[in-house]
From Swiss-Prot:
Reactions that this protein is recorded to catalyse: uridine(38/39/40) in tRNA = pseudouridine(38/39/40) in tRNA
Organism: Shewanella loihica (strain ATCC BAA-1088 / PV-4)
Gene3D superfamilies: Pseudouridine synthase I, catalytic domain, C-terminal subdomain (3.30.70.660), Pseudouridine synthase I, catalytic domain, N-terminal subdomain (3.30.70.580)
Membrane found in the keyword field: no
One GO molecular-function entry: RNA binding
Alphabetic keyword roster: Isomerase, tRNA processing
Gene (UniProt): truA
Protein name: tRNA pseudouridine synthase A
EC number: 5.4.99.12
GO BP terms in the entry: tRNA pseudouridine synthesis
Complexes and interactors: Homodimer.
Enzyme class: isomerase
């Protein structure tokens, strides 16, 4: 049988999602806990492989198992065997056609900026601290140039292994709630470091160091070296993955939890 899970995690102390030799990862921890509950080796597939220090409130995985378990075993039972910074949010049986990555039609990320003179104490691993005056309205205006299917070479990591630089951005919004600025972006898929590279360049606009039109110019240049530095990882969250409606997967608050959804 095939089971899908909704996962959230604080990626601060992990070397990314993907299992790696000699370093800790979210995938390794989750597979260990699932294998214990299933009493057999479990290998999982995820919707999006997050980098070191990146978080998720809406990660989705699936796995195959011969074990027959109640839903509570895949939620409460697995959570008991996970570290405190990883949690299963829901579980659902799915058909054999479902694939966490390839069935997904869109992914959504939120990047949380803590815009304050002083660094945070409590949320230091869940936000990226950028002091000084930031104009989120100009960031939002500039971000609209990203909409649609385009070549995102200027926002693609050098080590990106995708066969194509083209992605389709469905929506992007930059909003402020007090000292928090949220860059919320949804696309069919994302290139390696694409969101953080976009945020880095939007911040240049927000600080007034570049005009709103600069984002459009960067897209046309198709040159990563012309864009801004990659934004820090700790403000980034994978908050949602979209699937065909007939799967009826649970939809929870996007998060992170301090956002007023």
């Amino acid at each position: 049988m095939r089971v899908a899970l909704g996962i959230e995690y604080d990626g601060s102390r992990y070397f990314g999602w993907q299992r790696q030799a000699e370093v800790d990862s979210v995938q390794a921890q989750l597979e260990r806990a699932l294998s214990f509950v299933a009493n057999e080796p479990i290998s999982i597939q995820c919707a999006g492989r997050t980098d070191a220090g990146v978080h998720a409130t809406g990660q989705v995985v699936h796995f195959e198992t011969n074990a027959v378990r109640k839903e509570s075993a895949w939620t409460l039972g697995v959570n008991v065997n996970l570290p405190d910074d990883i949690a299963v949010r829901w579980a659902k049986d799915v058909d054999d056609e479902f694939h966490a990555r390839f069935t997904a039609t869109a992914r959504r990320y939120r990047y949380m900026i803590y815009n304050h003179q002083f660094r945070p104490g409590i949320l230091r691993s869940g936000v990226s601290h950028y002091p000084g005056q930031i104009d989120e309205a100009k960031m939002h205006e500039a971000a609209q140039f990203l909409l649609g299917e385009q070549d995102f070479t200027s926002f693609r990591a050098i080590q990106c292994q995708s066969n194509t630089p083209f992605r389709c951005v469905h929506e992007v919004n930059v909003t402020r709630q007090g000292m928090y600025i949220c860059v919320d972006i949804k696309a069919n898929a994302f290139l390696h470091h694409m969101v953080r590279n976009i945020v880095g360049s939007l911040l240049e606009v927000g600080y007034g160091r570049q005009p709103v039109s600069w984002i459009k110019e960067l897209l046309a240049l198709k040159d990563r070296t012309q864009a801004a530095a990659t934004a820090k990882p700790n403000g980034l969250y994978l908050v949602d993955v979209t699937y065909p409606e007939h799967y009826a997967l649970p939809k929870l608050a996007l998060g992170p939890l301090f956002m007023l959804d």
